[in-house]
Structures are given as structure tokens and as C-alpha cells.
């Protein structure tokens, strides 16, 4: 055998003495297939003498081992590396088919992805501006070339062309797409399996004999600090719902994220105890009570201001919308439910207002009862009641022109004091408890102190107007809901002057102090009455002195 594959070799030469020109041997040399089969079937005869050879290097041993032959080993190695190289070339060719150098395509001005879209977008430009003949010709040729290429390549599954015979190009393209999709799906299926293998819990590998050991292991090695989301602080996130817009398309609220500074801190919330909560609640209630008592003492002007500042909902009549409300058929069920909810809220507000007014009326009733009891108690223990004689009206005509005429008229009218006193006692027999001398009728100090207790309790002849006095009826005053509108109720409250009995007995407390009846301005009749009392006291004194024999200075009439 040749030592190297590159060396040329030929068939062995015929041995010496071989006669080719012999016709018999020539005929014998024409062997058939049958002779070839016989030759193969006959065993080889052992050669008696070997032909001479130049070198024994190329002679094969009797027991040939291919592994020991270096040439065979070289051939095996060469064929193995040739196969690897062939596989690598095929892989590179497949990658080269899938790979596109888009940068090179952009440099060359050939971009297959955007050619069709550019042509479609530029069709309007051809009509807008009159193109040149060369540009029109080049655009038409380009379009024709694209159509021809698409026909030759078979298009795709969406845009196919009629091709004679089987469209191998399209078939190959679809097969490649299916193969790539299957490969991607397999990769996606393999990824979770790898992740599950990596995420295998080491706890499963460890064997625990007791439950306590497992819990200790979990506490030491598996304790995780929980991460808190900053958006979920108390009061951080809120929902803003637009209630004013009744015709909104959607009822989706707006999410509002407040600043951290506006949110209450966790420490401030957790440090509150039950005592602090009770104290804060008590202070709140006391502040409400304090404000309520101040609001009761508002003047009429302030009341009018407050009523002007009231929202329009408070001015609505409770029966204002009854009979006017017509439900619309075009409204959605959600709008109807919203309307019903608002109606219920208004009814609740009205009930609360009524209950508040009733409670206020009950409080006034209780106050009147207490005042009545105080008045009765005062009447029982009053020692210095006003004499009923003073309540009698006196027929006093026009005042006299001078003091002389006044004295003359008094002397003519009341000739005897005893008779006058008798008539008075007949008129009022129930005035036995009256202390006459104490009030200055027959007191010797009357001349020095003419203004006595009667003057401090001056009463006019006019009848007292008790129509404004609160009689203490059980029904109570009129409330807000006894009027049709808020304007009528406010007008009634501004003009109302219902005073309790204590005001008639003790006077009305004004801003400058309590103004009682004893400080009331006296009219003309009261002034004349007081002057008459003074003069009658002087006359009585002189009569007594004359009776005792004392000389009295007489006036000159």
C-alpha cells in the first residue's frame, strides 16, 4: 500500500516471461462473470516462492491490526475533523440566512422592511407635485420589480401569488417560521423548570426529627423583614369622588396621594391611651356646650347676619319639592339610587332639626316652670308688697296753675282727713296688713323725707300690657316648621317680644345693667300724685299741731 495518499500509484506490472501475443492465452484472458465468481470461491494457494521486492517496508504482516497502523489513525482523525468542519459550515450558513446586516442596508439605501410603506406614503406626493419623467419612470420600475420579486418568492401567508407548480420558496419560508416558533416555545418551557430546580428549598434536604427543631431553623435562617410600602401609610392614599357632577360618564374615583408631612405619624397614634381619648372627648363636648351658651345671647342684628350666612339648603322648605319631582326615565339606576340617597339624607336632616326645635321648646317650658315656682315662692315670703290702694286710678284733672290754687282745691275736696280715710278703708277692707304710717301718711318725718317707699315703686295709672308676657302655655312658642318659608320665620323671630314673668317682676337685664320698673320715667299723673302726698302730709301735720294747741303759721290766700 502506498505510504501517503498524495503519492501516485498504479496496478502491478506483469511478471517476466508473460506472453501476451499467445492467441490461446488471449482467448483465455476473456473471462466472464462466472469465472470471476469461481475465482472468488476458490481458496488462495500458498505461494512457493515470493516475487522479489526492492524493500520489505511495505509488506503487511499476517496479523493486521488497524489501531496499530498510524496511517489508519491519521485517516480517522482527518475524517472526524472534516465532519466537524462541515457541521460548523452548515451552522454558519443557517445563521447567515437568518442574519441581516440592517446597517449595511441603510448605508446602501436598501431597506426591505420600509420599502413598501415608503412607496405607499409617497404615492400622494406624486399627485401633489408633478414629477419629472425620470422620477416617474424609476418609481414605476421599482414597483414592478417589487411585484416580480414577490411573485418569484411566493409572497407570504397573507399575500400569496399564483405560482406554477409547488411554491417551494413559500413552503420553505413557512417551515422556517414554524420551526423558530417551536424552538421559542421549547425555550420558554425549559426556563421555568430550570428556575424551579434553582429555587429548591434547602429545608427539604434537611431532615428534622422534632417540630421544635424545624421551628428553630425557620426562626434563625428564614426570618424575613417585611418590606413596607410607603404608599400604604394611614391617611396617605385617598379616593376623591366628584359628587357635584350628576351627569358624569363614569363613577371611578380619583386616587389622591398625600404628602408624608400631611399624614399623621404612627408614633402619635400609638401613644394615645384610653385616658387621653376620654379627656380629648370631654374637652370637645365642653367646648361645644360653651359655644352653645354664647350663641343664645346673640343680638337681633347678629341673628340676622347668621341667617344670611346660612347655606341655601337650610332655607329650603321641607315640603318644597313634594309634587314637583318627576322621575326621569332617561336616568340610569345608579343616578336614581343617588337621588334616593340624597332624599333620605334631607329627610334625616329635617327630622334632626325638628327634634332640635322640640328639645329647645321643652327647655323653654322647663325654664318657665322654674320661673313660675320662684314667683310663687316670692309671693309667699314677701313682706313689703306694694299697697293695692296705689294701684287704684285717681281722677286727677289738669294740674293747677300755682301752688295756692292746688292747696285751695285740696282743702275744698278733702275737708276732713278722717272722713277720707274712712272711705278709703271702706273701699279696701282687705288692706289690714298695710303699714300706713310706715309709708309716710301720718309720719312726723314726712316733711323732712317726702320721698318714701311709695316713690321707689311708682306706678302709673295706665294698665300694664300683659300681652307680651309669657303666660306659660304648655304648647310653647312657634317653631321653624310652623312657617312656610325661612323669611317668615325670621321676621316673626325678629318682631317677637315674649318676656317671662320674671321680666315684669324684676325687670329686664340690659347691656348697662338690670333695668327695673322703679327706675322707669314717671309720667305727669305720677308726679302729681307724689306732690299731693307731700302736701297732704304737711296739712295733716298742721292739723295735729292745731289740735294740740300749738300755734301754726297760716298761709295768706
Curated annotation (Swiss-Prot):
GO terms for molecular function: identical protein binding. The gene is Ik. GO terms for biological process: mitotic cell cycle; mitotic spindle assembly checkpoint signaling; mRNA splicing, via spliceosome; protein localization to kinetochore. Signal peptide: none annotated. The modification Phosphothreonine is found at residue 485. Involved in pre-mRNA splicing as a component of the spliceosome. Auxiliary spliceosomal protein that regulates selection of alternative splice sites in a small set of target pre-mRNA species. Required for normal mitotic cell cycle progression. Recruits MAD1L1 and MAD2L1 to kinetochores, and is required to trigger the spindle assembly checkpoint. Required for normal accumulation of SMU1. Component of the spliceosome B complex. Interacts with SMU1. Interacts with MAD1L1. May interact with DHX15. Keywords: Acetylation, Chromosome, Cytoplasm, Cytoskeleton, Isopeptide bond, mRNA processing, mRNA splicing, Nucleus, Phosphoprotein, Repeat, Spliceosome, Ubl conjugation. Belongs to the RED family. It comes from Rattus norvegicus (Rat). Pfam families: RED_C, RED_N. It is found in: Nucleus; Nucleus, Nucleoplasm; Chromosome; Cytoplasm, Cytoskeleton, Spindle pole. Residues 1-90, 181-205, 294-402 are annotated as: Disordered. Residues 16-25, 304-313, 332-398 have a biased composition (Basic and acidic residues). GO terms for cellular component: cytoplasm; mitotic spindle pole; nuclear chromosome; nucleoplasm; nucleus; U2-type precatalytic spliceosome. It comes from the Eukaryota. Sequence repeats lie at residues 342-343, 344-345, 346-347, 348-349, 350-351, 352-353, 354-355, 356-357, 358-359, 360-361, 362-363, 364-365, 366-367, 368-369, 370-371, 372-373, 374-375. InterPro entries: Red-like, RED_C, RED_N. This is Protein Red. The modification Phosphoserine is found at residues 287, 417, 460, 536. Residues 42-53 have a biased composition (Low complexity). Residues 342-375 are annotated as: 17 X 2 AA tandem repeats of R-[ED].
